[in-house]
A protein has these predicted regions:
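NAD(P)-dependent Rossmann-like dehydrogenase/reductase catalytic/cofactor-binding core
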Residues: 94-212
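Inter-helical turn/loop segments and adjacent helix faces that build the functional surface
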Residues: 47, 51, 79-87, 175
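Active-site-proximal catalytic alpha-helix in oxidoreductases
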Residues: 57-84, 88-102
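Rossmann-fold dinucleotide-binding core
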Residues: 1-75
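Short, structured loop/turn "capping" segments at alpha-beta junctions
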Residues: 49-52, 75, 82, 107-113
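Short, histidine-centered active-site or binding-site loop motifs used for metal coordination
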Residues: 21, 79, 152
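Residue-level recognition of alpha-helical structural elements
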Residues: 32-35, 85, 89, 157, ...
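Short, basic, helix/turn surface patches
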Residues: 26-31, 77-86, 206-211
Length: 212
């Protein structure tokens, strides 16, 4: 199942829905069966947006790529809206994604991104110059942060970045593709979690310097 639902624990017992509303369910690595169809029907009856995905492995890889920016937003203390608006932050995230695109090409792994753009097209879009205004007013109730940011902010002591950026690093090592930025994001975010360092210890420049 690929989960495309954003949520934030704003305080104990309160979960805020911060974006996305889709579950994609399929058999691994492709196809579907009675269980998949039955689960999707149950989800639809509960007013959840869900669908059967015949190529769920490709969708899971696409979700992993989306999650590569989580460590960056956590270390720099940026919301999704803030990072998406600033060309400096978009450029960093584009470079992180380009490392991943090179690795996936070398490994001959097919992926499917959310939306109509391919991964390479999304990277080109991130590199477009200028500030991007946020769609609508960004307030405390609409501002969204990834799960990794929440892990650091709540001092949970662990993060998932080794499953995200770490996967790209290990694939890069296997196929001889450099992944300097993904490596530094993984390593520094793991250190921040272990040391209970709150979000905001890094910026784009310090991360690039650490990757040299």
């Amino acid at each position: 199942c690929t989960v495309m639902v954003g949520a934030e624990i704003s305080r104990p017992g309160i979960v805020r829905h911060s974006g996305g509303y889709l579950l994609e369910v399929g058999a691994w690595p492709q196809g579907s069966d009675y269980v998949c169809n039955s689960l999707v029907n149950d989800l639809l009856r509960s007013e959840m947006n869900a669908r059967v995905d015949e190529r769920v492995a490709e969708g899971k890889w696409g979700k992993l790529i989306r999650n590569l920016a989580n460590a960056y937003l956590a270390l720099t203390d940026l919301s999704v809206q803030e990072a998406s608006s600033d060309p400096v932050d978009r450029s960093f995230m584009a470079d992180v994604n380009e490392e991943a695109a090179d690795v996936l090409d070398a490994a001959k792994i097919s992926i499917r991104m959310v939306g109509k753009r391919t991964l390479r097209e999304q990277i080109a879009r991130l590199r477009e110059p200028g500030w991007w205004p946020s769609p609508g007013e960004v307030t405390d109730s609409t501002r969204s942060y990834p799960s990794t940011w929440q892990d650091l902010a709540l001092e949970r002591g662990k993060v998932e970045v080794d499953h995200f950026n770490g996967t790209i690093v290990r694939l890069g090592e296997r196929h001889g593709v450099p992944t300097l930025l993904n490596r530094v994001l993984r390593d520094l975010c793991l250190d921040a979690a272990a040391n209970l360092t709150p979000p905001g210890s890094e910026n784009a420049d310090s991360l690039r310097a650490a990757a040299l």
